[in-house]
């Protein structure tokens, strides 16, 4: 990916810092609670894409620098921040074109654990968006596991895709889509609620594709393949097959590998947010 360093006042790099919150989320069955978190990644041994559980008794404390970042880590952080800025610029333009006002989210890089307005999480939760504080949270070491454990190609555009996917969840929060889904899920069975989650996640993949469409000047040969490889690796069917050897469609919350690639490509090829109604396409 062709990129130049971009800076944002809404970007925080907390890597190498301890304190500022006690990570309470570890393992076990994770369910839907008050705030639905649209998780991209997940926990080893559990389906990538689980819902993050809100925790109680989160502790806050003084933050202290515990280690210096390596040059490679700093560059990766600069890349993530730049992708975040490219996303905010693109969605500001799209919202302007549709006579809407875009509210810029925040983004936080962290190591090991983090406390958010939606609760506390370990890195095992994977990248996620918290609607409570409208911030994207990410431990960049997730992408090492994406390659080594789930077979993604890797590459910088895989990171760009995930950031764009999480930005898609912010778009859904602004538009009220996430709130409507939570309301509907409260009235549905678990299986029907899972189908709504799949629609929400695939729409975020579609929005990631729309972002890529608007940023053709940044894309190099092989970049789209990196994004599709990441999407393929985190399909519910692919993850369940690798982690348990069994595929249970009724438990899907993010969609199959094929669906995730399909909706990203649709967004990328069209660049038209009006074509991203995954709910009508999948539920009717």
Name these PLM-found stretches.
Residues 113-139:
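Catalytic zinc-binding patch centered on the HExxH motif and its immediate surroundings
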Residues 91, 138, 161-174, 204-205, ...:
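Active-site recognition of the HExxH zinc-binding catalytic motif
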Residues 173-201:
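Post-HEXXH active-site segment of zinc metalloproteases
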Residues 142-161, 192-198:
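Short pre-active-site segment immediately N-terminal to the catalytic Zn-binding motif
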Residues 74, 78-102, 192-195, 199-240:
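Short helix/loop segments within enzyme catalytic domains
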Residues 1-67:
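Long amphipathic alpha-helical segments used for membrane anchoring, targeting, substrate engagement
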Residues 234-284:
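Pan-zinc metallopeptidase signature
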Residues 60-77, 142:
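Acidic/histidine-rich, surface-exposed loop or edge segments in extracytoplasmic proteins
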């Amino acid at each position: 990916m062709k990129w130049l360093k971009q800076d944002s006042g809404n970007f925080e790099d907390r890597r190498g810092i301890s304190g500022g919150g006690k990570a309470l989320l570890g393992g076990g069955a994770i369910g839907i609670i008050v705030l639905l978190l649209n998780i991209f990644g997940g926990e080893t041994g559990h389906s990538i894409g689980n819902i993050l559980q809100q925790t109680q008794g989160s502790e806050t404390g003084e933050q202290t620098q515990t280690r210096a970042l390596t040059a490679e880590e700093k560059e990766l952080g600069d890349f993530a921040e730049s992708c975040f800025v490219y996303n905010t610029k693109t969605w500001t333009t799209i919202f302007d074109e549709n006579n809407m006002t875009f509210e810029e989210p925040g983004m936080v890089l962290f190591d090991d654990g983090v406390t958010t307005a939606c609760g506390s999480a370990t890195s095992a939760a994977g990248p996620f968006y918290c609607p409570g504080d409208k911030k994207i949270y990410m431990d960049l070491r997730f992408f090492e596991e994406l390659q080594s454990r789930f077979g993604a190609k890797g590459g910088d555009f895989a990171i760009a895709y995930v950031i764009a996917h999480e930005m898609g969840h912010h778009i859904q929060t602004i538009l009220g889509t996430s709130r409507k889904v939570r309301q509907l899920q409260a009235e549905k069975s678990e299986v029907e609620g899972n189908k709504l989650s799949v629609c929400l996640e695939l729409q975020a993949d579609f929005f990631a594709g729309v972002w890529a469409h608007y940023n053709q000047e940044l894309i190099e040969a092989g970049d789209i393949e990196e994004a599709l490889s990441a999407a393929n690796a985190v399909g519910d069917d692919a993850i369940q097959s690798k982690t348990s050897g069994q595929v249970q469609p009724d438990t899907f919350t993010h969609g199959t590998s094929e669906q995730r690639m399909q909706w990203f490509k649709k967004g990328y090829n069209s660049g038209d947010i009006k074509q991203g109604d995954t709910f009508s396409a999948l539920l009717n």
